[in-house]
Amino acid sequence: MRYFICFSYCGSNYQGSQSQPNATTVQGELERAFALILRQPAPIVMAGRTDAGVHAEQMWAHVDLPDTFPTEHLVFRLNGILPADIALQRIVPVCECAHARFDALSRTYEYRITMQKDPFHIGTRTRVRRGLDFERMNRAANSLIGKQDFQSFSRTKTDVKTFFCTITQAYWRIEKTDIDGNVTEATFVITANRFLRNMVRAIVGTLFEIGYGKRTVEDMETVIAAHDRSAAGDSAPASGLFLTHIAYPSSIFMPISTK
């Protein structure tokens, strides 16, 4: 029987979410935990991949379990095996044809920054210097909305069949200010039907250049039209990036028995 699993993780100690040879990954830890309980391999199919150092407040994956396997207390048992920086929230039954990656309707990422030195933000927020113009960055971010070719924000070596993505929201949200009204923490929020590798970090890096006045607001449209990675800014560091939400159609979820 197929199940969707919902979990979160701090990506600081992992070489990304997806399994790869001779590397510690989130998928590898999940498959190890399932195998210990099931006493047999249990391949996990992730909803997507995150790079090394990137975090997820909500990630989904699907796994096929034996029909007779009891799922009561499974979340508790798996959390007892998983490392402290991976937390399983729930396991829900889905249709046999449901796919964690291909059935996703949208994904939302947040990029979190701070202007202050804070030891409690190490690895979870990117520290930037003051002076960012958030009004300019939000005007530039508005150019991202819609279905467009985002090759300029993609890794150069990639095997994707299309660079088109549909972005439905992209904006900066002010989180904290000091007593003088200066921004000390902010978050960039972006939602799309799909994302290219390194896309969010490349967008944020380009927005930083606009925010600091190194580029004009109109340059964002020029970068998009170039279809060339070298036209965009440097990628922002991985540490401030979080996958925060993945949306699915309700039709793929099976009714949960209350008996």
Task: List PLM regions with ranges.
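Structured-RNA-binding interfaces characteristic of tRNA pseudouridine synthases
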Residues: M1-K259
